[in-house]
Amino acid sequence: MRKFLREKSSYIILICILLIQIIFMIFYCDMKKGYFVDEVWSYGLANSYYHAQIWEDGALDNPEISPEIFKDYLTVNKGETFKFGSVIYNQTHDSHPPLFYMVLHAISSCFPGQFSKWFGLIPNLLYYAITIVFLYKISRLIKKDKYFAFFPILFFGFSIAAVNMVTYIRMYMLLTMWCTIFAYEHLSIMATRKIKKRNLISILIATFGGLFTHYYFVIFAFPMVLVQMIWMIMRKDYKMTGMYVLSGAIGGAGAVVCYPTILKNLTGTGV
């Protein structure tokens, strides 16, 4: 009972810290003024209907450029809502996988003809919150001190790096979330010396999500997978190794099936 109360109190503290951090981030999101060019492309590639670049078809060649050209590029028009095929098409003319853009398009589709920074910032706040939770779980695995586990989330959660990732309307906060989940599941397997169904499902989802978000995920995941494989083979746990490989392979293959352009971009033969 005492252990249960201690655990409960630690999660209450975690929730309180997370709420404060979200309020902290909302403050910076509210102050956001202006957009870096890549953020403009985020909206354009997500919402422009089968029209990846605004200068295509000579749209900017006229001496007088109508504001409607930019509005059409950055917002979802009526009749073009939830057209994820358009998002995927646009990304085949860009250099990133489509998940981030699909989420941005889905939210923008709920508000046709409207543009708001919050369409991109609210998802980032959600990714940030999930990242904080898994960072806390990682800290608990590394050191079994529930109070020590608060220091990493305080250090990262209020850092300028976190502020930049949340307020920058690109895919990097989403990528960080997938990497944190991926890392936690690997550390969990090593800590418990067994692989659970939950671990397999999470690794599958994180692999799919990470590869479907940014190719940097491969750079992050490869050394972790290599170490995990060596560790399992040295323990001669071939059943665990097989399940682990299958889980990651399904996640990776699923991303490629959903977006075959991944292979071209990873091999340098794409855009």
Question: Whereabouts are the PLM-identified features?
Answer:
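Selective detector of the "anchor" transmembrane alpha-helix that sits immediately C-terminal
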Residues: 103, 122-140
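Interfacial juxtamembrane loops and adjacent helix segments
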Residues: 47-96, 108-113
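Helix-to-loop transition at the C-terminal end of transmembrane segments
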Residues: 23-41, 58-61, 257-271
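Perimembrane helix-loop-helix junctions
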Residues: 185-199, 207, 219-252
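Start-transfer (signal-anchor) and selected internal transmembrane alpha helices
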Residues: 1-25, 30-32
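Specific aromatic-rich, kink-prone transmembrane helix
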Residues: 106, 134-137, 154-158, 162, ...
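Aromatic- and kink-enriched transmembrane "portal" helix at the membrane-lumen/periplasm boundary
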Residues: 29, 98, 113-121, 125-128, ...
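Transmembrane-helix signature of polytopic, membrane-embedded enzymes
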Residues: 118, 135-158
